[in-house]
Amino acid sequence: MALWGGRFSQESSALFKLFNDSLPVDYRLVEEDIVGSIAWADAITGVGILSQQECQSLKQALQELLAEVKDQPETILASGAEDTHSFVEQALIAKVGDLGKKLHTGRSRNDQVATDLKLWCKKEGKALLELLAQLKAALLSLAERELDAVMPGYTHLQRAQPVAFGHWCLAYVEMFERDISRLQDCLQRLDTCPLGTGALAGTAYPMDRYALAKSLGFASPTLNSLDSVSDRDHVIELCSDAAISMMHLSRMAEDLIFFNSGEAGFIELDDQVTSGSSLMPQKKNPDALELIRGKTGRVYGSLMGILTTMKALPLAYNKDMQEDKEGLFDVMDSWSICLEMAALVLSGLKVNRENTLSAAQQGYANATELADYLVAKGMPFREAHHVVGEVVVEAIAQKKPIEEFELASLQVFASVIQEDVYQCLTIDSCLAKREALGGTSLTQVKAALAAKG
């Protein structure tokens, strides 16, 4: 039975019911709806709508229903109710009779769903903070495990300068720490309770909304009824936070997919996060990482979907806003599983140190060191840059690394070059000189690890 039938003389068409009903999506809010209803029972008791005995009867029935839906969630969808609010009210009436019809006094599904959704977002947001922390810990563990492994750093996907593998790990730690900060900010902003604002104009009953908000674990009540029931900023912000974090996950996945390729051979992924080919028996595919990269697109799509849905809605509530949940639920599910999977990938990852070191020694990654050496000898950097470019051209022609040139050959390009140049061209020297804060020297990487730990 619908909650709004008195105004209508005809039944809804079967097609409209299928089109209109939201239970197949919003059933995930049923626990929050019951918790909110328990708090509402106390609130309307405080203004004389319910007696203490009636309140206790309703709360007991709601607690029973909460246990039932946790134990047998399939009963929700089997009910045929229009939405999660209708399911709860119908189940309550089945338990306590006409008393159940009093619970909705002073309340609208508009403030009800806004409250349910915020409660759900708070719960899921806290779970995601834990997953982000676990991923950060996995990166720190990998950085410590492979602290002194050396690999080429890239710009334009070309070898640029040698870096410590731990430095690469710590770059993603920085990204995921920003994700944590953004999510914490979002959870702080959404921590206001809409319950008690009615359909749009506020409730007619003089209840203490501060006490109501506190009883549900919110920091405070919302302050404008029109905004309360039409606000979905928290949905947009969570989707945005997820999109940025998924971008970070996708970039990390792309790096690791390349590192894992036969062309690079820098790492080996554990069997438990890879799969094979139905035709080619030799294949070991990085499917976990590719799926992280692939799921990023659907998260972006959901963000654009809710932004587009909300962009032209007049105040206050509109049925369009029923479309806020499907995308949000998918975003949070996708973000969650990708964070878990990324941590699992990192936990079993092995670095092929010989390959990473060999790659770091190729591609003239020490060319910048030679330029810095010339600057130390008094040559202006722009001139030094040009001279080293000429050295690299000659090195490519001779198919040999810079450090294998004889001193006399190097002095053809710059007479200030002396025997001590060879000390500057080693991989160890390249790393050790990056001592400034945020650099890739082992001293800096160790300090960064200690600070993050």
Curated annotation (Swiss-Prot):
GO terms for cellular component: cytosol. HAMAP family: Arg_succ_lyase. The gene is argH. GO terms for molecular function: argininosuccinate lyase activity. Keywords: Amino-acid biosynthesis, Arginine biosynthesis, Cytoplasm, Lyase. It comes from the Bacteria. Its EC number is 4.3.2.1. The lineage of its organism: Bacteria, Pseudomonadati, Pseudomonadota, Gammaproteobacteria, Alteromonadales. InterPro entries: Arg_succ_lyase_C (IPR029419), Argininosuccinate_lyase (IPR009049), Fumarase/histidase_N (IPR024083), Fumarate_lyase_CS (IPR020557), Fumarate_lyase_fam (IPR000362), Fumarate_lyase_N (IPR022761), L-Aspartase-like (IPR008948). The keyword Magnesium does not apply. It is found in: Cytoplasm. Pathway: Amino-acid biosynthesis; L-arginine biosynthesis; L-arginine from L-ornithine and carbamoyl phosphate: step 3/3. GO terms for biological process: arginine biosynthetic process via ornithine; L-arginine biosynthetic process. It comes from Shewanella loihica (strain ATCC BAA-1088 / PV-4). Belongs to the lyase 1 family. Argininosuccinate lyase subfamily. The keyword Lyase applies. It is an enzyme of class 4 (lyase). It catalyses: 2-(N(omega)-L-arginino)succinate = fumarate + L-arginine. This is Argininosuccinate lyase.
